Amino acid sequence: MSTSAAKASAPSREAEFDVDLFVIGGGSGGIRAARVASGHGAKVMLAEEYRLGGTCVIRGCVPKKLFVYASRFSDTFDEAAEFGWRLSVPHFDWPSLVAAKDREITRLEGLYGTGQEGAGVEVVRSRAVLEDAHTVRLLEDGRRVRARTILIATGARPELPPFDGIELGITSDGVFDLKTFPRKLVIGGAGYIAMEFAGLFAALGSDVTVVCRGSNVLRGFDEDVRQAVAGSYTNRGIKLMFGDSIRRLERRDGDVGGGDHAGRIDVTTEQGGRLVADQVLLAFGRRPNTTSLGLTALGSRLGRTAQSLSTRAPARISRTSTPWVTCRTSST
């Protein structure tokens, strides 16, 4: 083919694609990738079905840090009295903390949206699924978008093992939005998410029990860290039940509960233990949001926990087993 013929065919090749990069997921990874790609001259579209910011901003790192900050005031009040301060008995108001969290999340979400707009990224509020290696369908309006490259940055969701009454429990996705403060909290699991919530709710005034399947908390962490955390939590009055797991949740007789499952819940463990809780937080780890995206229809292989099986690549960006479809992986 002559040079002039090659140049003449180039526009038709470019016309095959509506965008250079289509990002599925508006969390930290997707937002960053979209902005950087656009900054290098790529035409970028990003689809998010919920809120911009993803787990970290909306229901993870940011609200958790705000709650931890609030929980530390209880120690400050106690210490102030030892240094001469005379205070009336402090009263903690849960709805005020939730409202403050909502304001900050809304502010940050607005900044994310403004940043994408300023970078020239087109943001679409819709769930997106793959139809082939270069085509994405937007479920909100049925529109199809052709993309040179597709980046999957859909994050993860809580892992929920099957047991009776699991619908009465809550996960880390909803714990920041409870309408009433749980005076008695049972937590299933003893990983870092479970232990973070155990500590902050205990500091806010909850009676906390952690049901741990293993012989210690924080599996996978250094042994000295595990021992230190377990000892510190025990000294703070947090009850740790080792070698056990939740078997069943039941609503107490005559207690209809509320919209966020508020109300007394009977907890039965595998070892025959019985607990009563206002809320049961299920923190058994997380699994990737890769199901129902259309990956398997393309021939992409998913692992046992629904992760995309990929080739090695730097910077936590991996090729899937389908060419042109890329996943942003996460260490959390």
Give residue spans per PLM region.
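A conserved FAD-binding loop/helix module that cradles the flavin
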Residues: 35-36, 221-228, 324-332
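Glycine-rich FAD pyrophosphate-binding loop
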Residues: 22, 38-56, 206-217
